[in-house]
Amino acid sequence: MSYKGFPSHSKVSKEDQEFYDLKNKAAEYYRSNGVPQKIESVLNEMFWQKPDDIYGYLANYFSGLSYTPVISKITGKEVFDGRGLTAVQAEVHCIIRNEEKMVCGAVMDGSFDGLPDGVESGEMLSNGDLQHLSITMALKWIRENFSPVLRGFNPTDQTNVDKILSDFAMARYLEHKDSLIREKEEELRNEAMSEAPPQATPTSAPAKDKKGNDKGKKGNITENPLPPAEPPVPRLPGATAVGAVSLAVAKTAAELLGTPLYRHITAVRDPQAQKEMQLPVPIITIMSCGKNSAGKLNLLEEIILMPSSSLRVREVIGMGLDLQCEMRRILNGSTYKALPVGVSDEGALQVGFDRPEQALDLLAEACANLALPLGSDLHLAVNCAAHSLMDYSRGKYEVMSGCHKSPDELVDIYEGLINKYPAIRSLIDPFRKEDVGQWERLASVIGQSCCLLADAASNLCPRWREAKPLPPGATKAIIRHHSDMTISDLIQSIAEHKETILAAGSGDASMVDLAVGSGVSFLKLGGLRGAKRMDKYNRLMAIEEEQEGIAGAGEINQPVSFESESGWNSLTVSAK
């Protein structure tokens, strides 16, 4: 028996033939993939460069030739967020150089989806069934829907990943909305069936009813009824999976590309924007005198420092820290010594005052002692959080304990504060969103001296949910990265609203990267207490240093200045 490649007179065993065939296949396999040429090339290059770490050099060389990592699966876990509420963590696993690895994870605030508007954190905890349903549904979506569909996707393809997430959420939202409508219709039918038939009416009854109706009409002439609260927007249980997966994919892409997350988000938004990087101006919650404080005053939920865009991040933080120390020193004096002082949930100084003037006078005194430029490089915003102050039984706002004011009376209070303290340049949520007449009247009264911002009074939504216009007179909405919003939703919302404020929630420091990458103008991080908040401030400082002081540079697109007549007061937003 002879075999090609061997002498004709030789005899080759079956094992030798198989081994020879195997060697030929191996040689062909390596030749077809260019392995000999690449090995020869890297060995030649390495010889001339003579690196200290030979195998590290080889590893880097061949890593550059490996396939692009793709998503292999997405997993979900139930965790706790920064406020101790249950939340969903999404983790992205990729095939990297033939091995499956967990690359990055992301946790979204667990309190948003499936919960009614205006619910406080304590109420969320008591409503454990609804929260548990939302978390369970989110984990199911990740496991059964998102993971199979996104398998094989390049993590850098953020736009298409987000479209898949949004399309799925939209379909589920429409189903959920139809289900709620059917439940309401069924409830109304059951109520109608359970009602007893009307009793016979005496002949004299119409005259009495007419008289009674006349009295009612007379009373209505003098009444100014409070507009009822709008029904809460239907939340979609499980939608937190959308935001968690979208953010986890973005963080995974940045990790695999070896680039900071903010640069990757910038590239997703607009590759050309890398040349015009802009840092947001940090605004700091310096004091809280809201409902949770020990004093009678409820109205000033947050007093916020609004610095000029010319100040660097480190300068702004330094001013805020100095100001807090000085206010504490003053509070320890004889004038204020009896006032209860603590730290709010937002990480700010929490003081129990009885009147708004006391808080603003304290702040003005501290700024004067430190020679801080209050009214020039530093201005104030006041978050009134009026939606939380409404006493519906009285139809008035409880601005102080036992002191109730009508919406019209509240307009006069705000006008007086702005006239007395001209450093106040913004009021956040001065009324409920339903009090449209007072929004409009206050905007007319204060004119260009102050602008009105909507936070809780706004309804910015992901693309798959209906948005509503801002209250009349409000010049801007404060945007939040809600748990049911994708990265693309956030970028789109910011692009549609110029000179935007982004409020970071209880998430990690990646919110700062999202703010920088999405091109937001102002970043609301809360107070200067708490490790997680200071991590965010430190992250913003690190990005500023990396950008070599790009914030406030003349050739860069600067955020709007509060002193400019073409600034906030000239901006209008028709829809969120």
From Swiss-Prot:
Q: Give me any GO biological process, just one.
A: glycolytic process
What EC number(s) does the entry state? Answer: 4.2.1.11
Query: Which reaction does this chain catalyze?
Result: (2R)-2-phosphoglycerate = phosphoenolpyruvate + H2O
PANTHER family tied to this protein: ENOLASE, ENOLASE 4
Q: What's a single GO CC term here?
A: phosphopyruvate hydratase complex
Q: Where is the composition biased (Basic and acidic residues)?
A: 207-217
Q: Where is the composition biased (Low complexity)?
A: 196-206
Asked if the record carries the keyword Lyase, the reply is: yes
Which family does the UniProt entry place this protein in?
A: Belongs to the enolase family.
> At which positions is substrate bound?
302, 524
The protein's matches in InterPro entries, at most eight in alphabetical order, are given as: DD_ENO4 (IPR047500), Enolase (IPR000941), Enolase-like_C_sf (IPR036849), Enolase-like_N (IPR029017), Enolase_C (IPR020810), Enolase_N (IPR020811)
Segments carrying the region annotation (Disordered) are 187-232
Task: Give coiled-coil spans as residue ranges.
Answer: none
Q: Which GO terms describe its molecular function?
A: magnesium ion binding; phosphopyruvate hydratase activity
Which pathway does the UniProt entry assign to this protein? Carbohydrate degradation; glycolysis; pyruvate from D-glyceraldehyde 3-phosphate: step 4/5
Matching Pfam families: Enolase_C
User: Which EC class heads this enzyme's classification?
Assistant: lyase
**TM ranges:** none
Species the sequence originates in: Danio rerio (Zebrafish)
**Name of this protein:** Enolase 4
